[in-house]
Amino acid sequence: MKSLKKQRRIQIIALATVALVGSTALIGYAMRDGINYFRSPSQVMETPPEPTETFRIGGLVEEGTLQRGQGEAVRFSVTDGGASVPVTYVGVLPDLFEENQGMVGTGRYVNGVFEASEILAKHDETYMPKEVVDALKEQGVYREGDS
């Protein structure tokens, strides 16, 4: 009788383990396209990612680089004070997007240009994403009073 209970307990534990591993694998598989790693411009220039890799880049829109093209096409450079990466974007920019302001873009780095599929700007006059602040502090550009 005891061995039957013990065997049943082992079966339940084994089934629970298989279910846990299976659900973890399914969650990881489902999220593979939803995870975008953040990189600063310096990191992108040091180790350029593959053209197929989607990631986020953040920093300050470099002064004097914002160029509006035909329609909704925009070109600018994003910098963290240590390096600058050219960015292209086709779409409507956020209202608070301007030079010398923080931004985060999602896209791919192809042939030396970050091709953004999404651009986010700070949402008020004092906010800057934590990743951008950390990257700017690392380069010695960020000061606490900066917005």
UniProtKB/Swiss-Prot annotation:
This is Cytochrome c-type biogenesis protein CcmE. GO terms for biological process: cytochrome complex assembly. The chain crosses the membrane at residues 10-30. It is a single-pass type II membrane protein. The gene is ccmE. Disulfide bonds: none annotated. Heme chaperone required for the biogenesis of c-type cytochromes. Transiently binds heme delivered by CcmC and transfers the heme to apo-cytochromes in a process facilitated by CcmF and CcmH. It holds the Pfam family CcmE. It is found in: Cell inner membrane. GO terms for cellular component: plasma membrane. InterPro entries: CcmE (IPR004329), CcmE-like_sf (IPR036127), NA-bd_OB-fold (IPR012340). Heme binds at H123, Y127. PANTHER family: CYTOCHROME C-TYPE BIOGENESIS PROTEIN CCME HOMOLOG, MITOCHONDRIAL. GO terms for molecular function: heme binding; metal ion binding. It comes from the Bacteria. It comes from Ruegeria sp. (strain TM1040). Coiled coil: none annotated. Belongs to the CcmE/CycJ family. Residues 31-147 are periplasmic. Keywords: Cell inner membrane, Cell membrane, Cytochrome c-type biogenesis, Heme, Iron, Membrane, Metal-binding, Signal-anchor, Transmembrane, Transmembrane helix. The keyword Transmembrane helix applies. Residues 1-9 are cytoplasmic.
